[in-house]
């Protein structure tokens, strides 16, 4: 697989027209993420109510893979519980880092399938950090709350 194959239609669509792009007013949780290898920088904004993610958005700049992953992530996580978000992240992370398919609850299968276009980054280790930056940032936001944590994928 060459790098051009990574830029599938869905990746390009989300990179060119990211969904849920922009800051949320009064987020309950936020975090900043930075991938110094590629230059990706983003901030994730979340509203979590009663352990459920009611809204999630992001803003920042990054490569096509980073932007597409963040865009897909915002769509997938909205309406999920924090535990479900953790499960989707764990499955996605395993898939892009080791190629392992992690079983998820049946109600999360669609979420992990929607991330499949990004799994080709596994053969390009530097690009794995691009694909997972938004997910690590959401994890930091959930754990750090409204104070805003900064993470780096070095």
Give, region by region, the residue ranges found by the protein language model:
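Alpha-helical macromolecular-interaction surfaces
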Residues: 67-68, 87
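Secondary-structure capping and boundary motifs in well-ordered enzyme cores
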Residues: 38, 65, 123-127
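Structured beta-strand/loop patches that form or line metal/cofactor-binding pockets in enzymes
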Residues: 17, 21-60
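Short, thiol/selenol-centered motifs that function as redox-active sites or metal-ligating centers
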Residues: 60-67
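Alpha-helical support elements that line or immediately flank enzyme active sites
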Residues: 69-81
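Active-site phosphate/pyrophosphate-handling residues
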Residues: 42, 71, 129
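C-terminal binding/interaction regions
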Residues: 1-22, 80-154
């Amino acid at each position: 697989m060459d790098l051009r194959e990574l830029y599938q239609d869905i990746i390009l669509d989300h990179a060119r027209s990211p969904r849920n792009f922009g800051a949320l007013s009064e987020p309950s949780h936020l975090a900043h993420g930075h991938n110094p290898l590629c230059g990706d920088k983003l901030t994730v904004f979340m509203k979590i109510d009663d352990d459920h993610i009611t809204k999630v958005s992001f803003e920042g700049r990054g490569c096509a893979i980073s932007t597409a992953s963040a865009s897909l992530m915002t769509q997938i996580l909205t309406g999920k519980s924090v535990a479900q978000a953790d499960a989707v992240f764990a499955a996605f992370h395993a898939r892009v880092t080791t190629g392992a398919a992690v079983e998820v609850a049946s109600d999360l299968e669609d979420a992990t399938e929607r991330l499949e276009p990004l799994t080709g980054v596994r053969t390009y280790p530097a690009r794995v950090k691009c694909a997972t930056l938004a997910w690590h940032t959401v994890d930091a936001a959930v754990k750090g709350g409204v104070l805003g944590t900064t993470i780096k994928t070095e």
